[in-house]
UniProtKB/Swiss-Prot annotation:
Residues 53-104 form the bHLH domain. The keyword Nucleus applies. The gene is SOHLH1. It comes from the Eukaryota. It comes from Homo sapiens (Human). This is Spermatogenesis- and oogenesis-specific basic helix-loop-helix-containing protein 1. It is linked to Spermatogenic failure 32: An autosomal dominant infertility disorder caused by spermatogenesis defects that result in non-obstructive azoospermia. Ovarian dysgenesis 5: A disorder characterized by lack of spontaneous pubertal development, primary amenorrhea, uterine hypoplasia, and hypergonadotropic hypogonadism as a result of streak gonads. ODG5 is an autosomal recessive condition.
């Protein structure tokens, strides 16, 4: 027996010893571990631990997933409306959530309506900015002080360079209601000497714009006598528009105010002498001179003609053949 155990086939001699270890699987494994300690690390336990570790991980992840689902269902139950006969199981809660979302999307605005509302808001903001810019520009042109800075010491002067670089349209039909000369006159007094500092080209352009837009404003006394550039001639100084149009542009029967009728009632009987009714009345030179001096430079407008002439010289139905009587 000793010679057989010393043979180089130890597996055959180990088989009965393995079978003799308690006769069970656990005993066989323990015996195998004891026999394999000297040869190296055991490989059988590592094979047995692999599937068990993966199984434990799957169980843990499944438990976490179920916890999340139950928590979400509890939140949905609290958010959904309460009514009689509502089911509280998980499937019913999910179905009610889907139906509620469909109803909300049908009643609420869609994505296209959201885009339309956003674009309309942007247009409204841009319109408000445009109105604000127009208001500020009109205040600057009219010389109104800014509300934030309080009352300014003087009117604000517009930038002539910016005005020349971007002038308004030269078409009178598309022109703004306020002409350029009035804007310039309200911002500062017109001084011909200021054109020399601007240059001949800019001065010519500015004068051309003023002529198109209604003529130059009345010139004030220049601060310094600066000679006008050679070769240039000032346009005719246009005086402020008369309150009465010229006599050639008046109607045949001019409309007179109450004050003019009062003057006529006072001057008419005194200006006429004891002439017959059919003959023209003679004019008193003293009364004519007083009327002319009272009116000043309005002689060209025809006002003195109305105040000094008698009724016999009026054209139309107020002529010599007029007879006062009740209307027919």
């Amino acid at each position: 027996m000793a010679s057989r155990c010393s043979e180089p086939y130890p597996e055959v001699s180990r088989i009965p010893t393995v079978r003799g270890c308690n006769g069970s699987l656990s005993g066989a494994l323990s015996c195998c571990e004891d026999s394999a300690r000297g040869s190296g690390p055991p490989k059988a336990p590592t094979v047995a631990e692999g599937p068990s570790s993966c199984l434990r991980r799957n169980v843990i992840s499944e438990r976490e997933r179920r916890k999340r689902m139950s928590l979400s269902c509890e939140r949905l139950r609290a958010l959904l409306p309460q009514f009689d006969g509502r089911r509280e199981d998980m499937a019913s809660v999910l179905e009610m959530s889907v139906q509620f979302l469909r109803l909300a999307s049908a009643l609420g605005p869609s994505q296209e309506q959201h885009a339309i509302l956003a674009s309309s808001k942007e247009m409204w903001h841009s319109l408000q900015e445009d109105v604000l810019q127009l208001t500020l520009s009109s205040q600057i042109q009219a010389g109104v002080p800014d509300p934030g800075t309080g009352a300014s010491s003087g009117t604000r002067t517009p930038d002539v360079k910016a005005f020349l670089e971007s002038p308004w349209s030269l078409d009178p039909a598309s022109a703004s209601p306020e002409p350029v000369p009035h804007i310039l006159a309200s911002s500062r007094q017109w001084d011909p000497a200021s054109c020399t500092s601007l240059g001949t080209d800019k001065c010519e352009a500015l004068l051309g714009l003023c002529q198109v837009r209604g003529g130059l404003p009345p010139f004030s006394e220049p601060s310094s006598l600066v000679p006008w550039p050679p070769g240039r001639s000032l346009p005719k100084a246009v005086r402020p528009p008369l309150s009465w149009p010229p006599f050639s542009q008046q109607q045949t029967l001019p409309v007179m105010s109450g004050e003019a009728l009062g003057w006529l009632g006072q001057a008419g009987p005194l200006a006429m002498g004891a002439a017959p009714l059919g003959e023209p009345a003679k004019e008193d030179p003293m009364l004519a001179q007083e009327a002319g001096s009272a009116l000043g430079s309005d002689v060209d407008d025809g006002t003195s003609f109305l105040l000094t002439a008698g009724p016999s010289s009026w054209p139309g139905e107020w002529g010599p053949g007029f007879r006062a009587g009740p209307p027919a």
